[in-house]
């Protein structure tokens, strides 16, 4: 009971412990001798504990009072609190608390804008290099590009003949035109063509015509020196091309493709 009263917290001052001896129904054969012992209190008990502080807690509402002969209040001041100093993060222009920061506002903004713009330009340049290297890694290597070109000796192709080569997995037509074919294709009215294009815009030398031998309709291979116009004829669906590779009749929508080529001397051409 004593321990319960001591541990009851703020209710300890209002509780008291009592012990009563209740005699039993049987009488004792001999009177028992009772010896009273003194209860020794532990005076060395620490002050700041639950049992010791329970008697010092406020039992009523807190009321502030003032007197002429007594101190007005009790202050609890914490002298260990320090105000943080941000001087290491502030600029020299705004270190003085008595000076307005508006006088140096434009200079500080200009410096911030300059640093931001420089960082953006550097980031864009680095991103451009990364993207360029990534795209270049996807492109064909030097050995593949070397195989993508073909050299053709023009002296092996007689006049009026067409020779087919294999270039990048496609047929390549090289035609040595006669003067009559050159004059005939030059006189064609461009306005009447489905895909208007002048003959001189499709050749670098009038006597040589270099074309990709794939029909622009469904990708068939035309037959050279045949058709209604003496150029190329696709037997799959009846597309007729002239000696310049221009569509003249049939379902094909465009002219035959002219690849990239250049003449290396008078007797050699490099396609690709």
From Swiss-Prot:
Which InterPro entries does its entry note? bc1_Rieske_TM_sf, Globular_prot_asu/bsu, Rieske_2Fe-2S, Rieske_2Fe-2S_sf, Rieske_Fe-S_prot, Rieske_Fe-S_prot_C, Rieske_TM, Ubiquinol_cyt_c_Rdtase_Fe-S-su
Q: What is a single cellular component term in the Gene Ontology annotation?
A: respiratory chain complex III
Localization in the cell: Mitochondrion inner membrane
Q: Which GO terms describe its biological process?
A: mitochondrial electron transport, ubiquinol to cytochrome c
State which ranges are Mitochondrial matrix (membrane side): 77-104
Residue numbers on the Mitochondrial intermembrane membrane side: 139-272
Q: Where does [2Fe-2S] cluster bind?
A: 215, 217-218, 234, 237, 239
Recount the PTM note.
Proteolytic processing is necessary for the correct insertion of UQCRFS1 in the complex III dimer. Several fragments are generated during UQCRFS1 insertion, most probably due to the endogenous matrix-processing peptidase (MPP) activity of the 2 core protein subunits UQCRC1/QCR1 and UQCRC2/QCR2, which are homologous to the 2 mitochondrial-processing peptidase (MPP) subunits beta-MPP and alpha-MPP respectively. The action of the protease is also necessary for the clearance of the UQCRFS1 fragments.
Gene Ontology MF term list: 2 iron, 2 sulfur cluster binding; metal ion binding; oxidoreductase activity; ubiquinol-cytochrome-c reductase activity
In terms of PANTHER family, this protein maps to: CYTOCHROME B-C1 COMPLEX SUBUNIT RIESKE, MITOCHONDRIAL (PTHR10134)
Name of the featured protein: Cytochrome b-c1 complex subunit Rieske, mitochondrial
Which organism does this record belong to? Answer: Gallus gallus (Chicken)
- The record's gene field reads UQCRFS1
